Regions:
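Hydrophobic residues in well-ordered beta-strands that form the structural core
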Residues: 107, 318, 348, 376-378
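Sec-exported extracytoplasmic/periplasmic mature domains
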Residues: 56-60, 76, 88, 298-302, ...
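Proline-centered loop/turn at the N-terminus of a beta-strand
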Residues: 68, 315, 345, 373-375
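Short acidic, glycine-rich surface-loop motifs adjacent to enzyme active sites
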Residues: 28-41, 143-177, 183-186, 336-359, ...
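Substrate-binding/specificity loop regions of serine endopeptidase catalytic domains
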Residues: 328-329, 352-408
């Protein structure tokens, strides 16, 4: 096999490696029962959490009291038709008067607060914490050698820096390759659609299409396999474009060491004890995830719209600290403190990361919440990692004054 052919086959193999996982994440099976998550295995034959059974058998005739649940996330659509009646309202604030009526340091915080915005706008994308740490340590260690004389503390930092740089370069290379392959995939798909000559495509169109090269053959094969899952072409095309957006964000924002949007916030980032910054736009530029989470918790159970939330007494306090990228410890800590100080009894944190910039400031906020008898719920993640062996921040182990994690 010629060298150029081997290169082509290697690229094609990697192309399939990149593309197939994107679709495997979106595979569809039989439609689940409505509100399956609230159903019961014994009563309904569904592995739900037995919400409906609890209401009918344990809570029947009982009247609950409202509980404020803070959703620390990427934003919440407080006007969503299935949530708007379940949103926490700060009755001490007068809407839109530009005054901090309740003197808590946050102007017009009617439904919560956004710690990653300002009068300049909102942060949508940010780096991974890994990238921020590499950028922070670069001036000191980028040109250092293994033979360079360091103190014990510096040697530890240098070794950690080398480890992080290796991880960063590996992630960046994979993301760049993924983006390149998604560009090829998108261009090939556009070419195929143009040749077919119609927009409302069906399976038969791809069965009748004659690919002119190996890439087209693979694209057609993938699209046909997606049609076999009873998907419409519009949905398939959306998933392809989402794949492109995923890798584009990784390359241009998450892993771009020259990208730093913090100036939008305008805070003193080195001052972890700074509290009052941000704005009151709790929805932000992308509230899909936070709205989803809030809906699971508290979507109206009586309006026949969408799903029914787990609780009919939860009131959602929206706190925005999570961008498209890794959240920052200072913002997480302030989000926790804001929730506690403004009456939340439960804090939901559906986010996490593998590195921490300032673990101590988050630990102190967690301890503060515990002292006020507030329950914190933190996600384990979606990537099947053993979090006893691999870091996922914030975690249950507090750091001492030297930053070393101690116990649980």
């Amino acid at each position: 096999m010629a060298i150029e052919e081997r290169k082509h086959m290697k690229k094609l193999s990697y192309f399939l490696f990149i593309i197939f996982p994107l679709f495997s994440l979106a595979q569809t099976k039989d439609e689940p029962k409505a509100n399956w998550q609230n159903l019961d295995l014994k009563k309904d034959g569904v592995f739900g959490i037995s919400t409906e059974r609890a209401y009918s058998e344990l809570l029947n005739g009982k009247k609950g009291i409202p509980v404020v649940v803070a959703v620390i996330d990427g934003g919440v659509d407080v006007h969503h038709e299935d949530l708007r009646q379940e949103i926490w309202v700060n009755t001490k604030e007068i809407v839109g008067n530009g005054i901090d009526d309740d003197h808590n340091g946050y102007i017009d915080d009617v439904n919560g607060w956004d710690f990653i915005g300002s009068s300049r706008g909102n942060v949508q994308y940010d780096n991974l914490e890994l990238v921020r740490l590499v950028r922070k340590m670069q001036p000191k260690y980028a040109t250092a050698l293994n033979s360079t004389k360091f103190s014990d503390v510096e040697r530890k930092e240098f070794n950690q820096y080398q480890k992080m740089v290796a991880e960063y370069m590996d992630e960046l290379q994979n993301a760049q390759m993924g983006l390149a392959q998604m560009i090829v995939f998108n261009k090939t798909m556009d070419t195929i659609v143009a040749k077919i000559g119609k927009l409302d495509l069906v399976l038969l169109d791809f069965e009748n299409y004659s690919p002119v090269n190996d890439i087209e053959k693979k694209v057609v094969k993938i699209v046909r396999s997606e049609f076999a899952k009873n998907k419409e072409f519009k949905k398939i095309d959306e998933e392809i474009k989402d794949g492109f957006k995923y890798y584009d964000a990784k390359v241009n924002y998450h892993l771009n060491i020259d990208f730093d949007p913090r100036s939008i916030v305008g805070d003193d980032y080195q001052n972890s004890n700074e509290r009052t910054y941000g704005n009151n736009d709790v929805t932000g530029p992308d509230a899909v995830h936070g709205t989803h989470v809030s809906g699971i918790i508290a979507a109206s159970r009586s309006n026949d719209i969408g799903i029914g939330g787990v609780s009919d007494r939860a009131r959602i306090m929206a706190i925005r600290v999570v961008p498209d990228g890794d959240e920052r410890d200072k913002d997480v800590a302030n989000g926790i403190r804001y929730a506690v100080d403004n009456g939340a009894k439960v804090i939901n944190m559906s986010f996490g990361k593998g590195y921490s910039w300032d673990k101590k400031v988050v630990d102190e906020a967690v301890k503060y919440a515990m002292s006020k008898d507030v329950l914190l719920v933190h996600a384990a993640g979606n990537d099947s990692r053993n979090t006893e062996q691999k870091d996922n921040y914030p975690n249950k182990r507090f750091a001492d004054s030297l930053g070393v994690e101690k116990g649980e």
